[in-house]
Amino acid sequence: MPKKVLTGVVVSDKMQKTVTVLVERQFPHPLYGKVIKRSKKYLAHDPEERYKVGDVVEIIEARPISKRKRFRVLRLVEEGRLDLVEKYLVRRQNYASLSKRGGKA
């Protein structure tokens, strides 16, 4: 079985030899056909610590490196896309404010 290769944005590089990569995917709703966006964060191994927040990278499936780390960074696709990181942080802040108010907008 081939290994999964995913493309995403580095949203955190605060851990040693590890980056957090946000991968977004789009798919049509099975019944209504509307295109839905879903995102997931993966921990990826970065032994040289050369990838920074905002970099667009490819990650590849690997053997388990730690409890949550199952991917390693394959290559750099694009450098410094901080606009994508800002969009993620704003969305996260909005969700946090909703949870403090009990889910009411």
Swiss-Prot record:
Q: Which Pfam families match?
A: Ribosomal_S17 (PF00366)
InterPro entries assigned to the protein according to its UniProt record, in alphabetical order: NA-bd_OB-fold (IPR012340), Ribosomal_uS17 (IPR000266), Ribosomal_uS17_bact/chlr (IPR019984), Ribosomal_uS17_CS (IPR019979)
SUPFAM superfamilies in the cross-refs? Nucleic acid-binding proteins
One of the GO biological process terms: translation
Q: Does the keyword Ribonucleoprotein apply?
A: yes
> Molecular function terms in GO for this entry?
rRNA binding; structural constituent of ribosome
Q: Which PROSITE patterns match?
A: RIBOSOMAL_S17
* Alphabetical UniProt keywords: Ribonucleoprotein, Ribosomal protein, RNA-binding, rRNA-binding
Q: Name one GO cellular component term.
A: cytosolic small ribosomal subunit
Q: What HAMAP family does the record point to?
A: Ribosomal_uS17_B
- Of which family is this protein a member? Belongs to the universal ribosomal protein uS17 family.
Q: What does this protein do?
A: One of the primary rRNA binding proteins, it binds specifically to the 5'-end of 16S ribosomal RNA.
* Subunit organization: Part of the 30S ribosomal subunit.
Which PANTHER family does UniProt cross-reference here? 40S RIBOSOMAL PROTEIN S11 FAMILY MEMBER, SMALL RIBOSOMAL SUBUNIT PROTEIN US17M
What's the protein called, per UniProt?
A: Small ribosomal subunit protein uS17
Taxonomy, top ranks, is: Bacteria, Thermotogati, Deinococcota, Deinococci, Thermales
List the gene name: rpsQ
